[in-house]
Amino acid sequence: MTTFLIKHKASGKFLHPKGGSSNPANDTNLVLHSDIHERMYFQFDVVDERWGYIKHAASGKIVHPLGGKADPPNETKLVLHQDRHDRALFAMDFFNDNIIHKAGKYVHPKGGSTNPPNETLTVMHGDKHGAMEFIFVSPKNKDKRVLVYV
C-alpha cells in the first residue's frame, strides 16, 4: 500500500489530524497545515473498484464525515474514526484533483479559500472549484505525485 501526503493544490498545505497526534482520538478534526511529519501520512485501502478508505497511516483510523451519515450535508467536518463502513468510502480523482465521498460531495477547506491559514478545518461540500483541489504526493518529495491505487 502506497504511503502519501494529501496536498491542497492551491495553497500547498497538507491534510493533518488536528494536534498532530500519531494516535488521535475518534472524531479528531482534519485540518490543513504547512508542516510535514510522519503523523500526517495517509494510505488508500481500496474496497470496491475506485472506492476505498483513506487511512491515517500512523493510527489506522480512517477519514469520515463527522457523524457518519450516508449523505452528509454541506459543511460537514471531516474527522478520523476507527469504524469502517460504506459511509466512509471515498474515491481519489487524479484527473480532476478531487477527493469525492461516495454520496457525491467533495473535500474542501472550510470557507473555500485558495490560501487557507494553518488549522483550517476540512469539510464536505457539493461545489466544485479550484480551491477544493487536492493532489497526492510522496512523503520524500512533496512535489512528486504518487499513484494511490496500487
From Swiss-Prot:
Record keywords, A-Z: Glycoprotein, Hemagglutinin, Lectin
Inhibition and activation profile: Hemagglutination activity is not dependent on divalent cations. Hemagglutination activity is highly inhibited by D-galactose and N-acetyl-D-galactosamine, and to a lesser extent by raffinose. Also inhibited by melibiose and alpha-lactose, but not by beta-lactose or D-glucose.
Binding site for D-galactose 3: E75, H108, G111, D127, K128, H129
Gene3D superfamilies, per database record: 2.80.10.50
Domain of life (superkingdom): Eukaryota
Molecular-function GO terms, alphabetical: galactose binding
Record carries keyword Transferase: no
Residues the record marks as carrying a glycan: N26, N74, N118
Residues that hold D-galactose 2 according to the record: D27, H64, G67, D83, R84, H85
Subunit-structure text: Homodimer. Likely to form large oligomers; oligomerization enhances hemagglutination activity.
Protein name in the entry: Galactose-binding lectin
Organism: Mytilus californianus
